Amino acid sequence: MIPCSNRIQEILEWVNGNCIADIGCDHAYVVCNAILNHQSKKGYACDVAQGPLDNAKKTIEENHLSDFVSCRLLDGIQGLSDDVDQIIICGMGAKLIIDILSKGNLHSGLRFLLSSHKDDFALREYLHDHNIHIVREKMIYDHGHYYPILDCIVKDHIQNISFAQLHFGMNMKMDSTYLSYLDFEENKYKNILSKVNKPEFLEKIEYIKEIRTRRSEEHTSE
């Protein structure tokens, strides 16, 4: 396995497509490791700029993966090969991810791994409005920041999702990292409310309490 960040390792845990595409590939660590780990049979390292593709090509060649991984100069997912069944879009803001998704030719059954570094609510809202179901989520902590990873699939109908889930995750893995994230968010909003009275922040605290209550009820029923 090629050494990589904790964030990339967490993303790799949910890579399982036969043919994957890593959008904004940087050094192609995700797609190359997926091949080396026998999680995928082939893949594409994609970027809108030539520089990252040159870095990706170097990684591919150094690990003797030229028969399995190809580089593609693409604007998002436009022009992506039809054999791709899982697309990874991570390490960018939600607005850019949404822009990429909005320009793609999405079909039922196509799967995504998504991870934004800000505006999580906007991303989940877009997915909900466009029949992209969130199968599961997990929260990771890397270099002082929390990042959600969303495992998604395109469907032909809308997914039921609450406001609490839009804000703080759908089918989220309830581990210590996520619980620490909830504590961090709650303290942040309480600190804001101590200085200015804004109902929307009180509402978010209530959503966090709702999630904790649901988790407690699930543990009781086990």
Summary of predicted features, one role per range:
Residues 1-18, 32-33, 54-82:
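S-adenosyl-L-methionine
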Residues 27-39:
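Conserved SAM-binding loop of SAM-dependent methyltransferases across substrates and taxa
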